[in-house]
Amino acid sequence: ATPSGAIIVSLGSEYAGLFSNDDQLSKQILNAGEKVEEKLWRMPLHKNYDKLMNSKNADMQNINYVGGAGSTTAAQFLQRFILNKTPWAHLDIAGMAFSKYGGALNSGGATGFGVRLLNQLIDENYE
């Protein structure tokens, strides 16, 4: 999923963004991606980005009006809904979801990015 599409500015169409509050989970996801050749880059997720979601009119806003860090702010928005430090991860696949030129698995269009990665992650760590 892609809450903002802003990850494309950072990573283009070569890597998907990985946001997580847990180093072990991040390592598992990165390893799974490497094995199936679906590239990820871990992006920052930090409480300092919270101030970008402060609102004068509501509990919070889901957009960063200051500018910059759009994908990180979107992931930090998701973080606000995680209870009790539950390990979680978000794959921002905006740059990887479609391919004009195709690749090893398709001739163009929707790529299915993340399906093999998540299958590998589950096979290695959760079955």
Model-assigned labels for residue ranges:
Residues 1-127:
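A generic structural signal for tightly packed, nonpolar segments enriched in small/aliphatic residues
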